[in-house]
Amino acid sequence: MRLVFVGPPGAGKGTQAKLLCDKWGIPQIATGDMLRAAKATGQLPADLVAQMALGVLVPDEVVVGLIATRSLEADARAGFLLDGFPRTVPQAKALDALLSSRGQALDAVLALEVPRELLLERAVLRRTDKRTGQIYHLKYKPPPPDAELEHRADDQEEVVRTRVETYEQMTTELLPYYEERGLLRRINGVGGVEEITSRILATLPTLPTLPAP
């Protein structure tokens, strides 16, 4: 089972990715985490680290190289779920080439879709407990009275709005690319966690590599 999972910030992608990976026994390969780990262990050249600090996007070949290495590890033999990559058509083609060189291919691309205004509401009312790291929502998951709450910078309305717009711009061509290949599964991301998980699973019954329950 080789999957790509895409969705705007605040769509609940992280929650669903963990549930799916636990169900199928495959790793979640998050490119952001890989880059941070590579930076921390000195695997990236100093000039690239400096560019990352300025917000410059990491070259595709660097990310593909990290994915190539990670996807060969023992826990990824049965497949993996890619989170955060690809974001553009050139990246998608690079991923296709990598998998093709191994005689492999993607099984599906899951696109979690949530209306923009709901994304903003989810993020703007989200709070983090500074002591425990636990995430709460002032409307949907109120914190206990003793929580030491902070409103993270990346949950501010203008920041979230910009991130959502960036996601929409980047996927304008990416989603049609996968749709033309019959790989795209559009998932309604509005509802409870279990409800959304059921929708995802319902889009995948015909995949030949889908593990038995």
Segments the model singles out, each with a brief description of its role:
Residues M1-P213:
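Glycine-rich phosphate-binding loop of ATP-dependent small-molecule kinases
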